[in-house]
Amino acid sequence: MSNQGPLRPEEYLEPDCPLCGNPYESLHPVRPVPQQRILNKLDDYMSRRDYDGAERHLLYWLKEAEQGRDLRGQLLVCNELIGHYRKTGSRENAFRYAELALSLLEDMDFEGSISAGTTYVNAATAYSAFGENQRALELFERAKALYESTPHTQAHLLGGLYNNMALVLQTLGRFPEAFELYNKAMKTMETVPGGVLEQAITCLNMADAVAAQLGQEEGEARIFELLDRADELLHDKSAPHNGYYAFVCEKCSPTFSYYGYFAVAEELQREAKEIYERA
């Protein structure tokens, strides 16, 4: 027996597994971050359009999740950062956290999970927003295969996938495939509470697709039909008048203005402003 004193735990315990609890009392247990509290506070920042505050909030909790070895928490925050940087136009940061999120899926062996599908969609949407459409389509196809083969995939996830994937196909000039997915998105979101907002966005995307395929003059009747339907959906009584509604109003307003629906565009901007001022 050595006279150097008792063995220390690190001298006889196996290395910790970062994805599971250690049966021998891990020296560095996982400290989960409060996921719902993080999301609730993020909603508060976004309802006030406090993008700087939202960024600080997310980066703080990402660091906490990293220090606490909470891989699930890191994945959640990375997904939110992808969306944040996409909305604020930060290409480099959006791609950085997209790739970090994808690597976390590999680390956790989550690539066949619904969480993976959500991450693929978020990353693909960011790549699409900054013109990397082939990379986006690759990720959307992964998500589509996963969602459609998984029983009980939530309708809002499928609807969001179909709409955003169609937008990429439209950009690539693959119009028949794009319209097929837009129609799937419309049908799917009919079953989602508050899904009228996503349906309105899809209608406007379809109007742009018609204009791109046929030209504004030839496609005018169909374009106006889609714009009228989008206006109806945005003002449907089931639409939630919250921070997200304000964001959607701001997002849709320029499209209405582009096609000459100036009164509708101004009304949407006014509604968004009123919601933000009340927040």
List the predicted regions and their residue ranges:
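Short coil/turn linking the two alpha-helices of tandem helical-hairpin repeats
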Residues: 109, 124, 151, 193, ...
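Amphipathic alpha-helical segments of tetratricopeptide repeats
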Residues: 62-64, 102-107, 142-149, 183-191, ...
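Residues that mark the junctions of alpha-helical repeat units in TPR/alpha-solenoid scaffolds
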Residues: 34, 54, 67, 74, ...
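Conserved alpha-helical positions within TPR/SEL1-like repeat arrays
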Residues: 36-47, 73-87, 114-129, 156-171, ...
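Alpha-helical segment of the N-proximal tetratricopeptide repeat
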Residues: 31-68, 83, 87
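Short coil/turn linkers that connect adjacent helices within long alpha-helical scaffolds
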Residues: 28-29, 67-70, 107-111, 149-153, ...
